Amino acid sequence: MQQTGIQFPGPPAQPLKADPKLNLNSNVLAWIQTYNTLPTDKNPSSALAFADKLKFLRAWSDYYGYPVHIGEFGCYLKADPVSRARYYSTFRHAAEQQGLGWAIWDWSANFRYWDKKTGQPMPGMHEALFGKLN
């Protein structure tokens, strides 16, 4: 399976180059440019990309008195396994730090947790979401 080349957190050691055959729109090209050039503390592929949004959800929950459950978050299967696990772990910890419930997207499709071929979680996923396997 060909991987995207995007790692978490950014920036990458080697700049990501957009394939011209993909005809990417200007927003995606701008994202790639910032991903390639901004340091981790300002990178769109870092915890800071979602930390403020999670703080906003916590503030909304406190203000209105309703709990917030993040019904879907995930990382595309074509990201490298180490970055996927790191993203899931970082997002989960950030959500829990704000007292927000969460669920991943999805069980066994393009953002999969479960590997149907092996009958086990995808590499690093169980540890990222629940801690060490026994």
Residue ranges of model-derived segments:
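Substrate-binding clefts and catalytic carboxylate motifs of secreted carbohydrate-active enzymes
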Residues: M1-N134
